[in-house]
């Protein structure tokens, strides 16, 4: 459904129970991809394999007014505050890199935009899990503006910032989940074999991850308590991405931990 809605990639939909269809829409809400699901349903409305129960019809009707943002509108959303890396040294490198590029005579706006999308996805992945919205928007950007990106320069930036493998993971998801060709993603060094598994895990667990906030509370006796289950879940998620960039992964975890401490509720 998402492939059809986001990239016009039509294929026959396998029959699913009403429960699974409802679950798909719930995941779409959590992942912020309802506009693409809605368009996917529209493209498959004559598919005989898609059996509409009354409850499914009501759900499809409920999301039918979702509008797909333009690529430029999405870029504006994620760059209202420039995406940053968490690690201090990487953040400083990124600041210098951006300043140098903006002052360059051959400044490439599209290459900076591509970098912003990648960094935004890195932040989402390390703090919440893989974002299908971010991956889809990366794919849309590549197919609409990729010809204007200086991929040689982009690869150099990714290497300098130490996020080459995290970027390759994003590209691998485009290949595994959305059937992109590798030649559409020039910045990829290699396909990450765990891409599909990590995506499935994020889809399964993100609803639970976002249902409970990870924060500390002040008890009446002055002691501070934390939801240990959510803490362990965040720690396990961080461990899954250690191989891709241990420094940024640890920095992201500690930043989220510190933020939780700063928001202690009484």
Give each language-model segment a name.
Residues 1-266:
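Conserved NTP-donor binding/palm subdomain of two-metal-ion nucleotidyltransferases/polymerases, i.e.
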């Amino acid at each position: 459904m998402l492939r059809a809605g986001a990239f016009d990639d039509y294929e026959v939909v396998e029959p699913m129970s009403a429960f699974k269809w409802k679950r798909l829409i719930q995941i779409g809400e959590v992942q912020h991809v309802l506009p693409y699901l809605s368009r996917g349903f529209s493209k498959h409305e004559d598919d005989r394999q898609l059996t509409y129960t009354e409850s499914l019809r009501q759900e499809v009707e409920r999301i039918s007014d979702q509008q797909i943002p333009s690529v430029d509108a999405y870029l504006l959303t994620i760059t209202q505050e420039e995406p940053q890396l968490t690690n201090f040294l990487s953040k400083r490198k990124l600041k210098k890199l951006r300043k140098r590029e903006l002052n360059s005579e051959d400044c490439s706006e599209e290459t900076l935009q591509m970098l912003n999308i990648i960094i935004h996805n890195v932040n989402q992945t390390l703090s919440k899990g893989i974002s299908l919205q971010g991956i889809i928007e990366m794919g849309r950007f590549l197919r609409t503006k990729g010809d204007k990106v200086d991929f040689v320069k982009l690869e150099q930036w990714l290497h300098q910032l130490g996020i080459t493998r995290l970027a390759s993971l994003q590209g691998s998801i485009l290949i595994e989940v959305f059937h992109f060709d590798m030649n559409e993603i020039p910045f990829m060094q290699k396909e990450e074999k765990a891409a599909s598994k990590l995506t499935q895990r994020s889809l399964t667990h993100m609803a639970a991850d976002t249902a409970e906030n990870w924060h500390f509370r002040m008890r009446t006796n002055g002691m501070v308590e934390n939801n240990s289950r959510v803490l362990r879940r965040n720690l396990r998620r961080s461990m899954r991405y250690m191989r891709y960039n241990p420094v940024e992964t640890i920095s992201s975890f500690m930043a989220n931990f510190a933020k939780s401490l700063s928001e202690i509720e009484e």
